[in-house]
Amino acid sequence: MKTYRPVFGTIAILMISLALTAQGDAQEKIKIEYSSVDASNAVWYTAQDLGFFKKNGLDSQLIFIPSTTTAVSSIIAGDIPVGNASGGGVASAAVGGASLVMVGCALNTLPYELVVQQSIKSPEDLKGKSIGISRVGSASDVAARALIKGLGLEPVKDVPILQVGGAPERASAFRGGRIAGFPSPPGIIQLAQGMPHRVLISTADFHKRFEFPYICATTTKPYLSAHRDTVKRVLMALIESTHYFKTHKEESKKIIGKYSRQSNPAYLEDSYTAVAKLYDRVPLVTREGTEVQIKEAVARKTNATLRYEDIADDSIVRELEKSGFIDKVYK
């Protein structure tokens, strides 16, 4: 009997080891959405590309939906459990009865610039001419209105806003003269070869940071209630991804290039630089920016009421900060 004890002991240890390995390797399948290939959404695809979701126990399928309004519809329908959405889209859906909640925002401002025809040199030149956006309530819509106001003009009244579609459609409408300009993320102008243009104003020109819940992990209230730990792991992955992006410039530029399918050095440099400094270390949901979006959404819906607490719950982020998780990531 003594001869077999070591063997049995070894087998027991092996079985325990295999069981622990199986538990450690167990990955929860989840669909996660991102809404743009530009650098502002890099926190999402960097987390996927470098395995931060996997590190936090998620077998993630990253799905590209190039519109906040469409993405919001997918989250509401339950097709996407957690995804990126901006505060404007969430507020607009919420006043319509949707049970949506932003649980954390990596980017709480809107890094956009207003690209216009080269002949437009002043706000007065822009008056009466149309600006193109993707859809009402989208980030491009919010950016267009903020930039127009920044010029001292009134959106719609002084400068008509047209829904023309995504970035390719806006570029086509601009080239064809249907619109006089369009709001654009930083760096895109470097790709506008053959299109005479200028940047008339940028949110970076504003005297005060433009508060806006832009890149926000969003889900439904029922999903958050039933799968709080899953949402927590998504946020942990995004926090780790944000840290990597802010501290690994050249590697991050390559990832932007991979997802945007661009190799233009000036574009990669400008887009990375603009976004890296704006990503928040602690991804809380800006109250000031959210309340502005609530005000605008409520104004478009008769008898609608909405509060910050109705569409924002960053309690998980606060828990992660209090636990020391974020400090540990940034050591």
How would you label these PLM feature ranges?
Residues 1-11:
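Bacterial N-terminal signal peptides that target proteins for export
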Residues 9-19:
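Bacterial N-terminal signal peptides
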Residues 20-26:
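Sec/Tat signal peptide C-region and signal peptidase I cleavage site
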Residues 26-166, 170-176, 180-186, 196-203, ...:
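Short, glycine-/small- and polar/acidic-enriched structural segments
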Residues 34, 106-116, 197-224, 235, ...:
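Periplasmic-binding protein-like
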Residues 88-89, 168-260:
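Pocket-lining segment of extracytoplasmic ligand-binding domains
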Residues 225-305:
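Secondary-structure end/capping motifs
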Residues 295-331:
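Conserved C-terminal helix/tail region of periplasmic/extracytoplasmic solute-binding proteins
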